[in-house]
A protein has these predicted regions:
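Class I SAM-dependent methyltransferase Rossmann-like catalytic core
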Residues: 7-48
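N-terminal auxiliary segments of SAM/dcSAM-dependent transferases
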Residues: 1-7
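S-adenosylmethionine/decaboxylated-SAM
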Residues: 25-27, 39-222
Length: 222
């Protein structure tokens, strides 16, 4: 695992002016992600310039909206549980209130009834059982922030590596690395880093992998 300072990533975002570096984000409240991790995700997206994005864990749709607003040409897929797929599901105890909130917000997700909704495809189901075969080798950016239990984390990670584009620059980003509610995540990603070059942004909850980006990886390690 490579632990890097935030500027290492932000310096990879090349722009002709500060105006081009501007982004729009939803100001956080108690339900939405902190701005720092959102800025990291948007920087990763600016680096790889995704045509397609897949999000594990829609939650209330704020991060989905952040991505849609800042990348107007990008198609976004977002997956989360519905009432049917929740039946009999074994979740991490800390995920249960998040799922309850997600289901409560079904008709109030952040991107609904906005100009960006038409570029967002909502998918429903348990990601451990979902058939991702139709999305293989099609996603340029994958954001893993769904079920945090070890089984789901491993399943989502393996499916992410199947979905990531093989012929283009791509990125897989994991959220909640360092979240005290999920102490097993650093250990899991640490073991994964034995076979994959992973980067953790210090002072954040984000770890990422870059695909077909040897030059960028070298800069991050320098």
């Amino acid at each position: 695992m490579h632990n890097i300072r935030p500027h290492k990533l932000f310096n990879l975002v090349h722009s002709a002016s500060y105006l081009e570096r501007m982004v729009q984000v939803v100001l956080p409240d108690k339900e939405s992600p902190v701005v720092f991790d959102t800025a990291i995700l948007l920087a990763l997206a600016k680096v790889v310039r995704p045509r397609t994005i897949f999000e594990f864990g829609t939650y209330i749709g704020v991060q989905t909206l952040n991505l849609a607003v800042n990348f107007p040409e990008t198609k976004i897929y977002t997956l989360d549980l519905d009432e049917a797929s929740l039946q009999g599901l074994q979740q991490d105890p800390s995920d249960k209130p998040l799922t309850e909130r997600h289901l409560k917000y079904q008709t109030q997700l952040a991107f609904l009834n906005t100009p960006y909704e038409k570029r967002i495809t909502r998918l429903y189901g348990d990601s451990n059982k979902y058939d991702f075969s139709g999305l293989a080798n099609q996603m340029d950016l994958i954001y893993i922030d769904g079920g945090h239990d070890p089984v789901t984390l491993d399943s989502d990670t393996k499916n992410a590596f199947k979905m990531i584009s093989q012929g283009n620059a791509g990125c897989i980003a994991w959220h909640d690395h360092g979240n005290p509610l999920y102490p097993h995540i650093p250990e899991y990603l640490g073991k994964l880093s034995d076979s994959r070059q992973l980067f953790h942004i210090e002072e954040s909850w984000t770890t990422f992998f870059l695909q077909n980006s040897e030059g960028l990886v070298a800069l991050l390690k320098s």
